[in-house]
Amino acid sequence: MLIHDAIIGNLYPYDVDDNLILKACIDHDVAPEDEYSYEAKSVVARVSIEILVNLISLSSESDSGYSLSYNVDKLKERICFIAKSNGFADVADEYDIKPKVYIMD
């Protein structure tokens, strides 16, 4: 399995353009054609999260007679899941849609 394939797996069920995956890989200094390994898990997660965050700002798109829309809460849930699975607590907290209770002093 290639890193590109692992990223696509993380993004499922969201379909994104290969150029977006390539750009995110370049930004994170990883080659999409390299073999995926346990050592690459963290960077693949970061690349996947970056792409999903881009989809949040997009929320919907249309092209040549078809349109797509994205459920922002579901995107945030996916980001949170990937972040928690890879130990990125700060990212998980930022995108966690569950209500939070704060104790005021």
Give each language-model segment a name.
Residues 16, 53-105:
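Short loop/turn elements at secondary-structure junctions
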